[in-house]
């Protein structure tokens, strides 16, 4: 009788099937990305419209959680909308909208037919001398300044002056579909070519499949209001091990410095008088983090930086009877975040300067678009009902006029009629205390800025242009006409601050440097990654500089690039290079006559050596510091506050845009049925093979002992 020895290992048929399945999965994992690249064309240079929230409502845009997809239709004139809104047979549509048609009228039509609209991709227009576009409201920061129904009701809600007369309010609307900005012309051309190749029918007939489609991802986690999203985030962070925060308050840092150093650990005595020079750092537009802000912010803070440099060069600044504080507020676009926080800190003893220390307040508004030599002085009519304040304001205006008399290119003008202050940080200080203050601006009534808080408030809007044949380094040092004009305004401001601080001997010698102004304008509006900005920053901040303009949206991750660059620019322009080593610069407490309470110390990259082979780092000592610009509403957990700004930004998981070819619904259905049938057939075959494995897969005999 013959006997054989067999094993008890896995069935050979099953082992083969497992190996085959593993190979298929591995191939799918390895080849998935390459297949996706063949199907989709990603759009890498886009900017989304995101959701923002305040105490009462939400604004902005979002997609569905899985993204929104639609057939692309190019709208180059308003008549093209008919296909999208009524005639097109393949809704929903993804509208590729020419920038010039991005108006309130068109958006209202699209908003009213959301069942046929999947989303919107907006191209950049080329503004001309007669065009205008401001997605902001006509009365910016309404309700958070000094005027209300109970105080100055005749000035409340911009009753006498619509400051932003051209504002269409689009940036403060809520859209249920995604809206993206296409920033790259080449990507726009690719989309239009895809549209022309696949989506244009012959002789007015409907196009045949496959069609060119676009998919936009911008799902927002927060809904309804700041109170709702903050409450949800609070509950998550309290009770969840892995909390999912759905929104964050808009926040950053204010930049401030003193003409004469003060001990920040103890603050000022009540009898010490301080002159405040203020301006704003931030701007915004309809699209996230696209905020060039040339006229609405950059020209003003560049002018103040140049004025600070000029004033610090005066020989007798250390003997002036009053100190000067330069402040650059963040978040003013969103209901005065920075200034309201500083006032709050001053009132509660959390800032070294108190409200009672403020002698006078000079603020720079929009100053780059003077239509003549005039620079207008705006004051508050309500606080001047107090005779003492009225006299102080009169002295302030007289000092400004005297300072301007020595600069023939600038003529200081008073308003002929009683008028409210334009949107300004001064309003938040006046809410807390009657002080003498003035806002300097290039407009007497409505803004001259036709692109207020829009994507087109760029260098070209304030006439900052360069000869085409110059290199970037030559552009950096090329003094433009705008730089000269702003330098003149900076000179007037510096001389006025000098006299307000008690100076008398050197006013006429104070002169702002046009070279400084032109470098700052170039860095903030044209190319941040330049040799001068590199020299004034710390080594680990180099990545903040890009070959593009800086954007001035406050955001939620702080400090932002703008804040850092302004901080170090101000330190470079007003501070002093010391002989401290890197270790001493990082810890100056061990060095005699150096104090962290009086100064800030920064180890910066420094200029190139003579051979331009390496930089010469140095330690800069200055009085420049940062102060938190987070609305007091979030400090106090008053998320429904009407006293303080409550703006928050929704979080999101993915921001993405891509195009691809889409098949007809019929073909998709057939593909699904065939795929499902193939799956069922495969399962049946697999089952049958597995059931008959002992017959189909016979194991070979193993050699063994044979007995007879």
From Swiss-Prot:
Residue spans, topological domain Cytoplasmic: 690-708
Similarity comment: family membership: Belongs to the nicastrin family.
Cross-referenced SUPFAM superfamilies: Zn-dependent exopeptidases
Biological process, per Gene Ontology: adult behavior; amyloid precursor protein biosynthetic process; amyloid precursor protein catabolic process; amyloid precursor protein metabolic process; amyloid-beta formation; amyloid-beta metabolic process; cellular response to calcium ion; central nervous system myelination
Subcellular location: Membrane; Cytoplasmic vesicle membrane; Melanosome
UniProt entry keywords in alphabetical sequence: Cytoplasmic vesicle, Disulfide bond, Glycoprotein, Membrane, Notch signaling pathway, Signal, Transmembrane, Transmembrane helix
First-listed, main subcellular location of the protein, grouped into a coarse class: membrane
Domain of life of the native organism: Eukaryota
Protein modification: N-glycosylated.
Gene Ontology MF annotations: ATPase binding; endopeptidase activator activity; growth factor receptor binding; peptidase activity; protein-macromolecule adaptor activity
Quaternary structure and partners: Component of the gamma-secretase complex. The functional gamma-secretase complex is composed of at least four polypeptides: a presenilin homodimer (PSEN1 or PSEN2), nicastrin (NCSTN), APH1 (APH1A or APH1B) and PEN2. Binds to proteolytic processed C-terminal fragments C83 and C99 of the amyloid precursor protein (APP). Interacts with PSEN1 and PSEN2.
Name of the protein described by the UniProt record: Nicastrin
Function comment: Essential subunit of the gamma-secretase complex, an endoprotease complex that catalyzes the intramembrane cleavage of integral membrane proteins such as Notch receptors and APP (amyloid-beta precursor protein). The gamma-secretase complex plays a role in Notch and Wnt signaling cascades and regulation of downstream processes via its role in processing key regulatory proteins, and by regulating cytosolic CTNNB1 levels.
Phenotype upon gene inactivation: Full embryonic lethality. No embryos survive past 10.d dpc. At 9.5 dpc the embryos display a phenotype similar to that of Notch1-deficient mice, with defects in the development of the caudal part of the embryo and in somite segementation, defective vascular morphogenesis in the yolk sac, and patterning defects in the developing heart and neural tube. Assembly of the gamma-secretase complex and APP processing are disrupted.
Topology, Lumenal side: 28-668
Record: glycosylation sites: 44, 54, 128, 186, 203, 263, 386, 434, 463, 505, 529, 561, 572, 579, 593, 611
GO cellular component, one term: gamma-secretase complex
Membrane topology of this protein: Single-pass type I membrane protein
Keyword Glycoprotein attributed: yes
Signal peptide: 1-27
